[in-house]
Amino acid sequence: MSFDLATCRQSALQLLSRRDHSEYELYQKLALKGHPAEVIDEVVKYVLELGYLSDARYAASQARQIVHKGYGEQRLRQQLKEKRVAEEVIEQALAEQTIDWFELAKEVAHKKFKSGISHERSQYAKQVRYLQYRGFNFEQIRYALQASESDE
């Protein structure tokens, strides 16, 4: 085992001991530390075999964090795609979530817009954009804003 392989393994294990990473993310971080691509490939394969690296576990962890922070399904999909997680893994992580995205959108809208839903066109558009940015789709946004309006 060469010095490069040992240091790369140690770097990978240190990174994975702090939090889960996607394969792509781990690869990128090891490359930034200056490790050669062949060594990184071998180390990624090694940690995959040991079960220390799992895109499915990473996606599930990210899903929990996203929901806890009040972001929507589209935001979760976008973040996981940026980390190059496979589409079927993303679908599996979403299926494991027992969250009602409509109710989450309603909670986020209620928390953000304490003064209520605006009937002024520009303010209403601003509220819609905020919920879009948070990763909710139009049906969820419509439900959240109508539900918040009826709660007043």
UniProtKB/Swiss-Prot annotation:
Function: Modulates RecA activity.
Subcellular compartments: Cytoplasm
GO biological process, one term: regulation of DNA repair
Entry protein name: Regulatory protein RecX
InterPro entries tied to this protein: RecX_HTH_1st, RecX_HTH_2nd, RecX_HTH_3rd, Regulatory_RecX, WH-like_DNA-bd_sf
CC per GO annotation: cytoplasm
Gene, per the UniProt record: recX
Domain of life: Bacteria
Keywords associated with the record: Cytoplasm
PANTHER family: REGULATORY PROTEIN RECX FAMILY PROTEIN (PTHR33602:SF1)
Xref: Gene3D superfamilies: Winged helix-like DNA-binding domain superfamily/Winged helix DNA-binding domain
Short name of any one Pfam family annotated for the protein: RecX_HTH2
Keyword Cytoplasm: yes
Family (UniProt): Belongs to the RecX family.
